Amino acid sequence: MEDIGKAGFFSDKSIGTGENTPLLDSYTFDFDSGPYGGAHYTITGVPDMSTGFSTFAGTGLSATEMGYCYPFGVDPSSRGDGSIHPPKCRYEKSIMQVHPESGDLGMQGATLFPSSPTSLESVRKRALDLHCFLFTQLHCVTDEDLAEAILSPFIFSESVKEPTGPRANIIQRLIYASECLLGLISTLSFLWTGCEDSGNSPPASMANQQGPQFQFPSRTQHKSNSVLAQHLLGLAGRSLHLEDSANFTGRQHTASPSETSVVDLPTITTILTCHVGILSVYRYTFSRIHDALRACGSSPSGTPESELTSPHKRATTCSPLPNKDTLPLNMPFVLGLRVQLEIMTHMLDRMRAAWATAMEDHPGHEDHQQQQEEVKQHDRLSHHKRATLATLKSMLALNGHELSNQDGGTGIGAVGDLGDRVRRLLRNCDKGMY
């Protein structure tokens, strides 16, 4: 066990309550010195752990040796027989694919990342795709899913190529959804300003978000910029063909530049829904891992069972000390858990930074006239920011999330604190052996 510490595998073995030190402090880990049933393996990571999730190659480790601890699916009564079973990989798991252009579900080679310049249509499309992905692929997390994800760095290194493919585990899908959310958060300023920036202006048919501006001229002019108004005045140049349209509901009308064809849909609210949903998945994942680690050790004496099962109490109750009578945690499982904790923690940090960037104020110009325009635009922008944060706080509270002043009311701080508790409890449960 001492060889592992000499390899610099962990940056800190302390069990403090306030530090946030990484469990992994380098990108390459040589871990072939431990006598774990003759298993020798090398783990190699990549610098950006958020996008390089599960790009870890394991060698020389059999499936039997890669068993996982019993709270994640193995009957504790079977621990004494010496047999440990790896989690099942469900190749038949149905994963939704979203084609970047057609929007059809079930297409292979999908991506939720933007493939074109920012426009209202592209942002709506990405928000819709992420919303659908969240509610169809991340709505259910089982202990078996988590056990599979924690050991996946040693089993399926090729799954990183298709984070939404059939071999993608629950954490890969969560990280993928988080990356998509980062892209949507970066578009908030674009949505707040109502596309007033000419450099990011959408097509002419999408330009007006404020609703139709009907102008009814006098009858002597016989002109109107509104096609509907022309029909109301009986001045339209063509009939509506009501019989044909009644029988064929799939007809699409191509808007002319003078028409208002875009409804002001709640795109920002959809993005906020995705944010709250993704945070809920992080919170549930951390809670399930925390409960499993607690089952490996012992609960604090005198702590009611209701406090251990409450998400609020889970985030505030002190970590228990390990029970000397319990078996040590399975080493590959501890290693995989530390890797996945670092990945998820890093992604939460990126989400926090993305929100900070979206909410920051930009310096003004020296030109007086331009300053006046910027003051007006700044007032509108500040109003939209305050309204967005107020809505987000309400949605977080409605879903049982804790709010912290440190994260600006985005709910990331409380979820990150729960992740830190898992890290500290892991240090307790492994008894400093790893």
UniProtKB/Swiss-Prot annotation:
Please identify the protein, giving its name as recorded: Pyrichalasin H cluster regulator BC2
Q: Which residues form a coiled coil?
A: none
What is the recorded function of this protein according to its Swiss-Prot or TrEMBL entry? Transcription factor probably involved in regulation of gene cluster that mediates the biosynthesis of a tyrosine-derived cytochalasan acting as a fungal signal recognized by resistant rice plants and leads to avirulence in Pi33 resistant rice cultivars.
Main subcellular location: nucleus
Protein's UniProt keywords contain ATP-binding = no
- Residue ranges of the TM segments: none
Domain of life from the UniProt record: Eukaryota
| Single GO term (MF) | DNA binding
Report the GO terms under cellular component.
nucleus
Provide the alphabetized UniProt keywords. DNA-binding, Metal-binding, Nucleus, Transcription, Transcription regulation, Zinc
Which stretches does UniProt call biased (Basic and acidic residues)? 362-380
**Source species of the chain:** Pyricularia oryzae (strain 70-15 / ATCC MYA-4617 / FGSC 8958) (Rice blast fungus)
Q: Where is the composition biased (Polar residues)?
A: 298-309
Induction annotation: Expressed exclusively during fungal penetration of host leaves, the time point at which plant defense reactions are triggered.
Compartments, record wording: Nucleus
Question: What pairs make up the disulfide bonds?
Answer: none
| Disordered: annotated span | 297-321, 362-383
